[in-house]
């Protein structure tokens, strides 16, 4: 399988987490793009017109008992929506309805507590047990009946929570002999999810001028986030290393595509900005206090500065009033494999240009290409 992520093109992206087991595992297909993450990203984008980033945290061993510990390590405040798929194991193990209700209530309350105030949670019901070939038997009928009972409880618990929605699961279509699940099954499930998710995502999407959770963070939270971000930077092992063609190629493409004098993949490291890759006559290292990237990484979306000389954040910046006389900047955050914003893919020019001329979809795609290289490097390492 490829990296546990999927993306669909667009701007103003929604960030989704799929967590659990069962349909989240992607059995039957060769990539997450063909499985539920990719299918859901495309289905949501088709409805919203926005980009979608889907992160996957799935394991066959994940259960209702292990879920709280696994979820609290994922920084849930990053996500606009969280999809949970659990229950088949509990249905087959005949977990008591009382225990299921108690533990599920605790889990979903934890999710609402640890996520942001605009995050919506979607609890996917059990796939009909006998639609799973290995359990299509009289013994499977017992688990199937219990799964229905657990789903009734799940629906009741979800109804009692303000940001949680229950979505009943459908059976996978009967596929070719010997094949368990196909890309068609994942597309169908993604459409089912997207039908329920689209409206809450639209309603919860931050309007211009609203404060993001990151902007509302208390000073101590900002410190904690910065420490986690720096650990992610250090863990990549790329600081002060030689240029690599895999990054330089993407940066050069950015420069050509946007027609700018400079382009770079920048990394914010303690009190400096260091460029892992850059094209054009631009310093490889500058103080963080002068860095446009330092502003870019404060939010998940793009930063576009049409004319730095008229922007109050940058008009006194030594790089604007002196060499190299930056006027235009566009950057998109680059995330580490663990989700911290460690730098940016950016393009810069000494001439201003209208914001409307900037292809933000392309800028995001180039930043995602850098992220893909970072993730591949982490897997190899």
Where are these regions (language model features)?
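Histidine-centered active-site loop/cap adjacent to the catalytic His
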Residues: 177-213
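N-terminal secretory targeting modules
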Residues: 1-17, 201-204
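Short beta-strand-to-loop transition segments that serve as allosteric relay/switch motifs
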Residues: 344-353
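Regulatory sensory and allosteric helical modules in signal-transduction proteins
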Residues: 262, 267-268, 272-276, 283-327
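Intrinsically disordered, low-complexity terminal regulatory regions
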Residues: 210-290, 358-360, 364-381
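Conserved SGNH/GDSL esterase-like catalytic core that processes O-acyl groups on lipids
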Residues: 15-17, 23-102
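A short, aliphatic-rich beta-strand micro-motif
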Residues: 327-336
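Substrate-gating cap/lid alpha-helix
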Residues: 131-167
């Amino acid at each position: 399988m490829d990296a546990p992520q999927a993306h669909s093109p667009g701007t103003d992206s929604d960030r989704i987490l799929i967590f659990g087991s069962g349909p989240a595992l992607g059995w039957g297909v060769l990539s997450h793009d063909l499985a539920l993450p990719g299918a859901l990203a495309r289905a949501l984008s088709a409805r919203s017109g926005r980009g979608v980033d889907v992160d996957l945290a799935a394991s066959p061993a994940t259960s209702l008992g292990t879920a709280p510990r696994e979820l609290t390590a994922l920084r849930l405040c990053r996500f606009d929506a969280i999809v949970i798929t659990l229950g088949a194991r509990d249905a087959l193990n005949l977990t008591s309805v009382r225990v299921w209700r108690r533990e599920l209530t605790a889990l979903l309350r934890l999710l609402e507590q640890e996520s942001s105030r605009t995050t919506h949670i979607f609890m996917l019901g059990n796939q009909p047990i006998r639609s799973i070939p290995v359990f299509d038997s009289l013994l499977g009928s017992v688990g199937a009946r219990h799964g229905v009972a657990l789903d009734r409880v799940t629906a009741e618990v979800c109804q009692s929570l303000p940001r949680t929605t229950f979505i009943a699961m459908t059976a996978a279509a009967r596929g070719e002999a010997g094949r368990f699940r196909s890309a068609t099954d994942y597309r169908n499930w993604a459409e089912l999810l997207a039908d329920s998710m689209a409206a809450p995502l639209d309603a919860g999407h931050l309007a211009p001028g609203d404060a993001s959770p990151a902007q509302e963070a208390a000073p101590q939270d900002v410190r904690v986030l910065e420490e986690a971000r720096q650990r992610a930077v250090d863990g990549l092992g790329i600081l002060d290393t030689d240029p690599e063609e895999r990054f330089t190629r993407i940066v050069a493409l950015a420069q050509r595509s946007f027609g700018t004098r400079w382009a770079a993949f920048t990394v914010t490291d303690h009190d400096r900005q260091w460029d892992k890759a850059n094209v054009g006559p631009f310093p490889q290292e500058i103080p963080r206090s002068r860095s446009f990237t330092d502003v870019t990484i404060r939010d998940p979306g793009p930063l576009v500065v049409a004319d730095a000389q008229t922007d109050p954040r940058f008009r006194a910046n030594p790089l604007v009033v002196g060499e190299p006389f930056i006027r235009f900047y566009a950057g998109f955050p680059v995330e580490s494999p663990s989700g911290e914003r460690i730098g940016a893919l950016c393009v810069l020019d000494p001439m201003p240009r209208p914001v409307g001329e900037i292809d933000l979809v392309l800028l995001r795609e180039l930043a995602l290409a850098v992220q893909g290289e970072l993730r591949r490097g982490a897997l190899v390492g």
